[in-house]
């Protein structure tokens, strides 16, 4: 086999070792290796979608998990890939839908509009979560400057919510998400939804979003 992955050995970029991407990727890699007629796939920890595309571009990896919005940024040379479009890739499969979850422990926050002036975690600056948050805020005519933005990962956001250090957090992951489940066992937790008018506005500017209703009881 080839150490560069050009033969029967493929590197599969996933995500952080505590996240869904790495766990799911490891299972997929093992299944392909077991049933792939000599193809060996190794799951590798990574920093997520942007990192995965960049590593595939350099042929450090041949497979990777990528959010559809980040894939759009790469293809069109936007945002995370401003001025550096990368279109030399193909989609193998769409696996599952990730939800943009807006989480709070404050029952008075019932709408994205209520986030104005609040302390809100919107993910690492420049991350996929960060741009998801900006998209949704923009649908309500809000910007990063209209909130007291914090730049935390899911676990840190959940801890900060539990400790009352932030008012809300954007979490982009398949529901149920461990960080939110853990928070909900310790403190009353609420998800903030979008109304039809603002969903339509969001989809008009960013067509890679789809409406999704998280089933009642997901975090009970």
Regions found by a protein language model. Give the residues of each.
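Pocket-flanking alpha-helical
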Residues: 29-30, 42-83, 102, 155-160, ...
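Loop/turn elements at helix/coil->beta-strand transitions in domains of secreted/extracellular proteins
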Residues: 37-39, 60-62, 87, 117-118, ...
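N-terminal Sec signal peptide cleavage junction
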Residues: 1-2
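Bilobed "Venus flytrap"/periplasmic-binding protein-like clamshell domains
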Residues: 7-35, 39-40, 97-163
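Extracytoplasmic
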Residues: 7, 36-38, 48-51, 58, ...
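A structural signal for short loop-to-beta-strand junctions that line the ligand-binding cleft
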Residues: 82-95, 218-220
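Pocket-lining segment of extracytoplasmic ligand-binding domains
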Residues: 68-70, 78-79, 144-220
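Residues that cap or initiate secondary-structure elements
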Residues: 18, 49, 69-70, 108, ...
């Amino acid at each position: 086999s080839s150490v560069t992955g050009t033969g029967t050995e493929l590197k599969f970029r996933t995500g952080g070792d505590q996240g869904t991407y790495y766990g799911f990727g490891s299972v997929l890699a093992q299944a392909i290796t077991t049933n792939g007629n000599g193809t060996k796939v190794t799951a590798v920890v990574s920093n997520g979608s942007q990192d995965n595309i960049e590593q595939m571009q350099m042929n450090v990896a041949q497979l990777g998990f990528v959010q559809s919005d980040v894939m759009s940024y790469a293809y069109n040379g936007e945002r995370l890939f401003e001025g550096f479009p990368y279109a030399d890739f193909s989609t193998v499969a769409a696996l599952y839908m990730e939800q943009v979850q807006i989480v709070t422990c404050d029952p008075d926050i019932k709408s994205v509009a209520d986030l104005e002036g609040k302390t809100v975690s919107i993910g690492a600056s420049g991350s996929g979560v960060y741009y998801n948050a900006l998209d949704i805020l923009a649908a309500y005519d809000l910007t990063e400057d209209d909130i007291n933005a914090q730049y935390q990962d899911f676990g840190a956001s959940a801890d900060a919510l539990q400790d009352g250090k932030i008012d809300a957090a954007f979490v982009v992951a398949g529901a149920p998400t461990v960080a939110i489940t853990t928070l909900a066992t310790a403190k009353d937790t609420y998800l903030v939804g979008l109304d039809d008018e603002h969903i339509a506005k969001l989809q008009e500017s960013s067509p890679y979003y789809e409406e999704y209703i998280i089933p009642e009881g997901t975090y009970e």
